[in-house]
Amino acid sequence: MKEKKEIFTLLHQDAASPARTGVLELPHGKVLTPAFMPVGTAATVKAMTKDDLDEIGFEIILANTYHLFLRPGIEVIKAAGGLHGFSDWKKNFLTDSGGFQVFSLSQLRKITEEGVKFQSHIDGSRQFLSPEIAVELQTGFNSDIQMQLDICSSFGISKTQTLADLKITMNWLDRAFAAWHNTPHEYDGALFPIVQGGFFEDLRLQSLEAILKHEPRGIAIGGLSIGEPKDLYQEYLSFTAKHIPKNKPLYVMGIGTPDYILEAVKNGVDIFDCVLPSRNARNGNLFTHEGAISIKRKEYEFDFNPIDSQCKCKVCRQYTRAYLRHLFRTKEILYSMLATYHNLAFLYSMVQDIREAIQNDSFNDYYKNFLKKYENRLD
């Protein structure tokens, strides 16, 4: 059995909202919260070196179990000493269970209580993923935080189908914790369960009740930002978050735009991840304090200003919008490197500012002032 322990320390609670600062104590170092985690699908954040991530200041990144399980495979990563030895990223890794990719990428998948059978999107080979295998893989990766295998119910499905999904997820929850408790003694990564239940309050509470019996070190909220209207995201984020014990670090999966991050922090969320900041950067969409801009637009052809005059990242200190537009249009590799660096540095700096506002009991003012400028732009 793994020891019961708390990995989260509350540093400050905002005076007028659930927003809070804290610190996560993980095997590969501390993580100040709130914290955004860049997504490194194949143990690398696309177009970024580990030194880039370190230079910006990130203390934790995410890697995808599904992709790493299929290629290069668990044996290669274990032989390298886990993800840290394989990638030379010395700080923390959070890994997902692989379930979301199985359901979104794979063809001919079949879900049963035992697990999910699926075909690889790479070569069509038949594969099987269960709660126990997900824990075994992530333990082999030496993940600092690993996630429970779950079913993320699609937006818009019936309550009957959502309940059927939830029953399987709760079965997998029990099996995941049984497997985690049997991992080697020297492995000290945390297992985070995931609150599901779709857009039904009673099912969300049923999911959380099952989770709390396991006294987890942290809890994730899943099944949000999956295509629902923004007001529904806000409603169910707020509803779910307020029922989670305050001594647990709270992770909301799949959010990474400034407006969604602010809404999460406003509800007491501590960590969040999303592929969009880096993917959008590669596709020409860049964050600024005045809203996102599309660098491919002709209006930037003679614009010799930085991406964002308020941003202190090295890209904004050295390069202009006109130059970045040129790199994008000529499909230069350097474009993806510079654009990704900027978007991730922008979010990191924003979250630093959020932490400072919380410490000063002025989060609500920061929230309103940021969104007033950010949402006022249509590009």
Swiss-Prot record:
The active site is at residues 96, 273. GO terms for biological process: queuosine biosynthetic process; tRNA wobble guanine modification; tRNA-guanine transglycosylation. Binds 1 zinc ion per subunit. Keywords: Glycosyltransferase, Metal-binding, Queuosine biosynthesis, Transferase, tRNA processing, Zinc. Zn(2+) binds at residues 311, 313, 316, 342. InterPro entries: ArchSynthase1/Queuine_TRR, TGT, TGT-like_sf, tRNA_ribo_trans-like. Its EC number is 2.4.2.29. It comes from the Bacteria. Residues 254-260 are annotated as: RNA binding. The keyword Transferase applies. It catalyses: 7-aminomethyl-7-carbaguanine + guanosine(34) in tRNA = 7-aminomethyl-7-carbaguanosine(34) in tRNA + guanine. Homodimer. Within each dimer, one monomer is responsible for RNA recognition and catalysis, while the other monomer binds to the replacement base PreQ1. Belongs to the queuine tRNA-ribosyltransferase family. This is Queuine tRNA-ribosyltransferase.
